[in-house]
Amino acid sequence: LDENGRGKRPVVNQKRGEPREFGRLLQDIVGVEAIVNRVVVHEPFDAQMKWIEETNRDYEIENLIIVGGESSNVKYPGPSVNEVLHSISREYNENGGDIFCGGIAIPSRTAESKNLIKKSENGSEFFTTQVLYDSSNIIKMIGHYQERCDELNTFPRRLLLSFAPVSSQKNIEFLKWLGVEIPSET
């Protein structure tokens, strides 16, 4: 599925290397644990789990961020983020697997704290945000998330905040196309 709902892509989509191969090289050469993102909604559940098991076993990647689709209004052919998180944490890891799972947090999304709780219940141990250029939504989301955790008597999962420099107007246009909120004064 492509991203036609957003209009014309402002930057040409480049052919990319296999992220798990890059992750393995990063681990081998630099000596740090890699975290690999995996979009799970575009292929069937069994194909996703096979990829995840191979990534853990053959590439020695132990940290994954499980990513969904661009919109909750689209019916994707693959499993949901929560289905995959649940399968990894409750089945794969309990049978000898060793994957530390995370998820994506999008601070501008309404009621994102509920999504974080649900992902945590299904096995997400940490979250990383979409790239941030405005602090208001992340401050609000963290506050709501802490309140929900307190109400449920559970602990908040680690939240990694993502930042990136912008060097051109073309970068800004692409980030906006991706759905990143950038204040007009930026």
What are these regions (language model features)?
Residues E33-A47, D98-E112, T186:
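Active-site mouth loops of central-metabolism enzymes
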Residues T55-N56, K119, G123, L161:
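Conserved, mostly hydrophobic/aromatic
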Residues L64-I106, C149-T186:
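Active-site pocket-lining/capping segments in soluble small-molecule metabolic enzymes
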Residues E60-I61, S124:
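A structural motif
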Residues R9-V39, F45:
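Flavin-dependent oxidoreductase catalytic cores
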Residues D2-G5, V40-E43, G68-S72, A105-R109, ...:
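Active-site-proximal loop/turn and secondary-structure-junction residues that shape catalytic pockets
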Residues L1-P19, G69-Y76, T129-Y145:
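Glycine-rich, proline-tolerant flexible connector loops at the mouths of alpha/beta enzymes
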